[in-house]
């Protein structure tokens, strides 16, 4: 059986961690792309030298040439710049839209049949732009956000309740930002809903509210602690979980920023936004789940925030 090929566009902290995890999970050969001369090659060589130690036997190469993405099965995109002090939202959008244009064209010309995962922020609009420029079909492109946000929600709940995180199932929907919607109705601990835990007095409502708030600002909390840079271990782990579900046809249902069709969740237009999504060898399939009236209202607020970003991006493109 031919080995799978995984292309990682962006060789920064997330890209390097993605490469290491892909090797450890033996998902396939890895191509690490970056525009910085020498940097992806150095990281690739370092990673390649872990293979004898880890007991894996895969190829890793670094490159500055999009041609090396040819025939990739999966492309994970982390390229872009983070928001810096003094930078407006439109400044960040303008820069990263240009990055997505370059990356999208690289995908279109070299691996148009790849399954594409976008991690670049602001996520919901970047995955939209990446599809626009790459031409990848709706079912073959998705944004990584909900898996990470849900992992943060699960972590905080497990810590609060002093239980194994493996016993906590919790989900987050909506845009990847302050308006995300942690689903307290369908989230549970060993099958017991959070609502039931609150009723039984095992989880105070004010503590649950605080956890929801902390989940929404989870990325910012890490940025504040690091002072330079942002999270990369958990984002990379989330991206690899999604890639593995595609490569191994696991059919996992994960919260992701997929292209949701008009009519689902009350949408009046097709939109990339975080919803439960099945990821299989056929690509992605958004799934509509039952949520409470309050959660539906919150989701609409989040959808409107994503639409506002789309409008801002359209204005930038029109200039």
From Swiss-Prot:
Write one Gene Ontology MF term. L-lactate dehydrogenase activity
Amino acids binding substrate: 83, 89, 121, 152
Q: What is catalysed by this protein?
A: (S)-malate + NAD(+) = oxaloacetate + NADH + H(+)
Q: What is its EC number?
A: 1.1.1.37
- Which keywords has UniProt assigned to this entry? NAD, Oxidoreductase, Tricarboxylic acid cycle
Q: Which Pfam families match?
A: Ldh_1_C, Ldh_1_N
User: Alphabetically, which GO biological process terms does the record hold?
Assistant: lactate metabolic process; tricarboxylic acid cycle
For the keyword Oxidoreductase, the answer is yes
Q: Where is the active site?
A: 176 (proton acceptor)
Membership in a protein family: Belongs to the LDH/MDH superfamily. MDH type 3 family.
What is the annotated role of this protein in its UniProt record? Catalyzes the reversible oxidation of malate to oxaloacetate.
Protein name (database record): Malate dehydrogenase
Q: Which organism is it from?
A: Francisella tularensis subsp. novicida (strain U112)
